[in-house]
Amino acid sequence: MASQTIPKLKSVLYCDVCTLPVEYCEFEGTLKKCKEWLKSSHPDVYDKLYGEQDLSKDLENTLNVSGTKDSNAEEQPAKLTKEEKRVEREEAKRMASKVLIKTIERTKRKRVTTVQGLDAFGIETKKAAKMLANKFATGASVTKTADKKDEIVVQGDLNYDIFDFILEKFKEVPEDNIKIVEDTKSKKKQ
């Protein structure tokens, strides 16, 4: 056997904003944020990828068609693309939504726990119901509420257990967005 040269592995730099290689950031909807991150974290790579483009854009912004300097060009903020606006709206909507965990009393001493709002975070409610049923060895189903939203109904009083389960299994749901609603019905005095 002749001496074989083993090729070295290439090191790929991934963007912290969109999690793609930095060469592909332009295909994601967050190019402006990706450029800002790359410029602050890896200025040499930023100059290699976007250095000439930024210079030409700066020249276009500072000089208008007649060649005179435009004072408003520097003051105007860069407009977000439709994709970036859509992504920001979805993120804001997702962060504003809440997951409600509520226990409802049924006949005699039986209780059911309902979980609403998981679908706002991109979690499939049927799969979540199946996971809850397996975890707590109880019945769980997906039903539609009066306002046409999915809710998971789990048999048993499992408020805090489900709270911990959601934090453990579904990392995309922040702890601040999970709310346990206590059912405080006054019982009849006998």
From Swiss-Prot:
One of its GO terms (biological process) is translation reinitiation. It holds the Pfam family DENR_N. Gene3D superfamilies: SUI1-like domain. Coiled coil: none annotated. GO terms for molecular function: translation initiation factor activity. Residues 63-83 are annotated as: Disordered. GO terms for cellular component: cytosol. Keywords: Cytoplasm. Its main location: cytoplasm. Residues 99-170 form the SUI1 domain. It is found in: Cytoplasm. InterPro entries: DENR/SUI1_TIF, DENR_C, DENR_eukaryotes, DENR_N, SUI1, SUI1_dom_sf. The keyword Lipid metabolism does not apply. Interacts with the 40S ribosomal subunit. The SUI1 domain may be involved in RNA binding. Belongs to the DENR family. This is Translation machinery-associated protein 22. It comes from Schizosaccharomyces pombe (strain 972 / ATCC 24843) (Fission yeast).
